[in-house]
UniProtKB/Swiss-Prot annotation:
SUPFAM superfamilies: S-adenosyl-L-methionine-dependent methyltransferases. One of its GO terms (molecular function) is methyltransferase activity. Pfam families: Methyltransf_31 (PF13847). InterPro entries: Methyltranfer_dom, SAM-dependent_MTases_sf. Coiled coil: none annotated. Disulfide bonds: none annotated. It comes from Methanocaldococcus jannaschii (strain ATCC 43067 / DSM 2661 / JAL-1 / JCM 10045 / NBRC 100440). This is Uncharacterized protein MJ0906. It comes from the Archaea.
Length: 366
């Protein structure tokens, strides 16, 4: 155990004692350290996964409220309340250049039943109720919430054009900005969950799809010097940052490639594939999964983590996530476990699949 015995001595003082506020805080720290040291690794892993899931569930509520607020701010709900228009009349009533964005908003609101069709006209659904579950605030990673606050803010530029420079710049940030985002607690926790579950160790061969700038050093530290790490990313800038971090520490044992993963030549040599927040950008899910399965040997595992897997949590409002993520032209969509299983079966693979929380799937090739 790592707790400081000097702290205990300072508090108890070797006899009877009274605990003041400061002493109580010190004892709380000691108790937390002891509990953390003796807590089984499975429980620690479960708590980390719960942190991720709670963050996304809270974010779903926040995005839904923001979506409704935008309906008022953009003048969409007032127009519908006043005119009860047909869908074809919408482009004539809105004042913004990007009519498609307004139509996309209305279609999403219809799916959410915030709006409704009645006699071929669109109307406000006055029976819509917004039920929000009070989140566990001590289990929310606030930095990831801030990321979406930024995305929803730039959505107003889509009223002009989906290709507005403000939107394009937001999703093509300077690599240094993305490097800072990838170092945040949310993404750091995602890396920890992957390494804890897979029990990554020296000698392992890892393929990291969409590795970014932070994952390479994190995973190479674990497998060096006997193992091998291959990091693939479409951002040359992020790979350059990663290279600067690792080239002086490791003379070999790794490769970083600035290519689209679907264009690599698969080799059945990897023990593990890490695919974190990347699958939603795959142009073809079938091709993407086939490439990953072709890159691991029998017994190898693919660790897929996304914000959520469809149908895992009824409290997740996928429609609002999809609406705002469409601002990124590379976004393709979220998938269910069934989507993945059906594709793998159609490709003829033998596999086992395990679900961890609401956003992680682990596929083992048999």
């Amino acid at each position: 155990m790592k707790f400081d015995s000097a702290k205990i001595e300072n508090v108890v003082g070797g006899g009877s004692f009274e605990i003041g506020d400061d002493d109580s805080k010190i004892l709380d720290e000691i108790i937390s350290e002891v509990i953390n040291d003796i807590m089984p690794s499975e429980i620690k892993l479960k708590k980390k996964i719960e942190m991720i899931d709670n963050t996304i569930e809270y974010l779903s509520y926040e995005l839904l409220v923001t979506f409704i607020k935008h309906g008022v701010e953009f003048g969409i709900f007032p127009i519908i309340a006043k005119y009860s228009p047909k869908i074809d009349d919408i482009p004539l009533l809105v004042k913004y250049p990007n009519k498609q964005f307004i139509l996309d908003y209305i279609k999403t609101a219809l799916k959410l039943e915030i709006l409704k069709y009645e006699d071929e006209k669109i109307k406000i659904n006055e029976d819509f109720e917004l039920n929000i579950k009070m989140p566990k605030f001590d289990k929310i990673i606030s930095d990831y919430v801030m990321k979406y606050n930024f995305i929803t803010h730039v959505s107003r530029y889509a009223l002009i054009s989906y290709s507005h420079p403000k939107i394009a710049i937001s999703f093509k940030k300077d690599p240094d900005i993305w490097d800072m985002i990838l170092s945040s607690p949310y993404y750091s926790l995602c890396r920890e969950i992957a390494s804890d579950y897979l029990k990554i160790d020296k000698g392992d061969y890892i393929l990291d799809v969409g590795c970014g700038s932070r994952s390479p050093k994190y995973f190479i530290d674990m497998i060096y010097p006997e193992g091998h790490y291959m990091g693939v990313d479409i951002s040359k800038g992020l790979l350059q940052i990663a290279e600067c971090r690792i080239k002086r520490l490791y003379c070999d044992s790794y490769e970083l490639k600035n290519i689209d993963f679907t264009k690599i030549i698969p080799k059945e040599k990897y023990d593990y594939i890490i695919c974190s927040h990347t699958m939603i950008y795959a142009p073809s899910l079938k091709q993407f999964l086939n490439k990953m399965m072709s890159s691991i040997h029998s017994g190898g595992k693919i660790f897929i983590s996304e914000e959520f897997i469809l149908d895992k949590n009824e409290n997740i409002c996928k429609e609002v996530f999809e609406f705002y993520n469409r601002l990124n032209k590379r976004f393709r969509g979220y998938y269910s476990e069934k989507d993945i299983v059906d594709i793998l079966e159609s490709l003829g693979y033998d596999f086992k699949i395990e679900s961890l929380g609401n956003g992680i799937l682990v596929i083992e090739k048999i």
